[in-house]
């Protein structure tokens, strides 16, 4: 069993602030580039394709390595991995701002992805170790504010900073926040698993996972350009299927696997993780809806972003409400309520056939429900995932949960964008946007069914 010395140390507000600040280095600062793509094209004198690679590579690398980092946190120390992640963010930020060389921009963003992979599971594990009962639920609420809230604010934040101070100040501020986080976390006793032997790291599993995810990403983002009957597409599909199959076989046989599939024997953990993947996938809503109102209704990017202000406000407000609902109703009901409300919001945003004024009203109300639903869902889902993981495996469990977040968002955006482009070319942008938004609503419905079937009414397995 793990011995985190709770008698000697209990989580406090100083540590919690440090944790939240470390979390927003990714969800707020690193993600802010989604709103400064044209500026980066001019600053680095490069094409939009290169900039898009730089923007997307952070979340992709975070998703690919977060599980492995969770395992390292369990073995070598969660405080240590958190500090390493913060230092990596500082290094990545410096590489981004010191020159106008596109290669350094991409390398810096890649390093920021590795930073997020270290920080996310390690900080969740620290909360699991040093916060108990209602204190843990409160800590998870603030952690969720840093992640879900940060992702909601990042677009406006990036645009505001880039306009008022210049885009490099996004990362200068990120470095300052990182240094403050290091100071606040300093002095916290180390916590790690005592029951996991320090075996050789599962390199084979990691390599196969990276190959599989990179191949899937290429298939989704470039599939329509390649053509589903092309030799390259078929080859990539075979590589993806083959690497996935081999990964499953090797991981089940490994004595110290990268992903411990035994965790999924717990239905509550499986339900929380699968629904988390799908509800992060509905991030495609923002891409599709914003693109539609700009191209279809002639709105500026600022006007398009203004439609989602209700989402930003509600997700921040409702995260703490979700915590209170968790304490009074348990995990399942808030997760179902949140997902159901989100589906209603998604359906309202998809009504692209309405006259402009009516559609704008539906969008504003829809985004309100969208943020309300995600805010209610966030804390109960996170609590369900880590509360149902064995203490000695909590780093790996948290890593898998956050991998679901990162990859759900990445693939949700890719799928939504692909469907929007394909259907728009076949029909028109109104129909393309509607079908793509229905895809997101479908992911919400599937998430609702998973929660209904897998998450128990009472979490008897909570530790």
Swiss-Prot record:
It is a multi-pass membrane protein. It is found in: Cell membrane. The keyword Membrane applies. One of its GO terms (molecular function) is transmembrane transporter activity. The chain crosses the membrane at residues 17-37, 53-73, 86-106, 107-127, 142-162, 165-185, 201-221, 230-250, 273-293, 299-319, 334-354, 357-377, 403-423, 435-455. Keywords: Antibiotic resistance, Cell membrane, Membrane, Transmembrane, Transmembrane helix, Transport. InterPro entries: MFS (IPR011701), MFS_dom (IPR020846), MFS_trans_sf (IPR036259). Multidrug efflux pump that acts independently of NorA and is one of the factors that confers resistance against diverse quinolones and chemical compounds. This is Quinolone resistance protein NorB. It comes from Staphylococcus aureus (strain N315).
